Amino acid sequence: GGIAIYWGQNGNEGTLTQTCNTGKYSYVNIAFLNKFGNGQTPEINLA
């Protein structure tokens, strides 16, 4: 079990660090992860 949250482009959500540090969520789904895998540096689009 556990609670999951969808974190992404809304500036009112706070930072990813703040979200993780609440201790409320077992899983944090990161929205708009547009570059990943194949040795690439992960990149998120927060525009």
UniProtKB/Swiss-Prot annotation:
InterPro entries: Glyco_hydro18_cat (IPR001223), Glycoside_hydrolase_SF (IPR017853), Glycosyl_Hydrlase18_Chitinase (IPR050542). Keywords: Carbohydrate metabolism, Chitin degradation, Glycosidase, Hydrolase, Multifunctional enzyme, Polysaccharide degradation, Secreted. The keyword Nucleotide-binding does not apply. Coiled coil: none annotated. Its EC number is 3.2.1.14, 3.2.1.17. It is an enzyme of class 3 (hydrolase). GO terms for molecular function: endochitinase activity; lysozyme activity. Signal peptide: none annotated. It catalyses: Random endo-hydrolysis of N-acetyl-beta-D-glucosaminide (1->4)-beta-linkages in chitin and chitodextrins; Hydrolysis of (1->4)-beta-linkages between N-acetylmuramic acid and N-acetyl-D-glucosamine residues in a peptidoglycan and between N-acetyl-D-glucosamine residues in chitodextrins. Bifunctional enzyme with lysozyme/chitinase activity. PANTHER family: ACIDIC ENDOCHITINASE, ENDOCHITINASE. Belongs to the glycosyl hydrolase 18 family. Chitinase class II subfamily. This is Bifunctional chitinase/lysozyme. It comes from Parthenocissus quinquefolia. The lineage of its organism: Eukaryota, Viridiplantae, Streptophyta, Embryophyta, Tracheophyta.
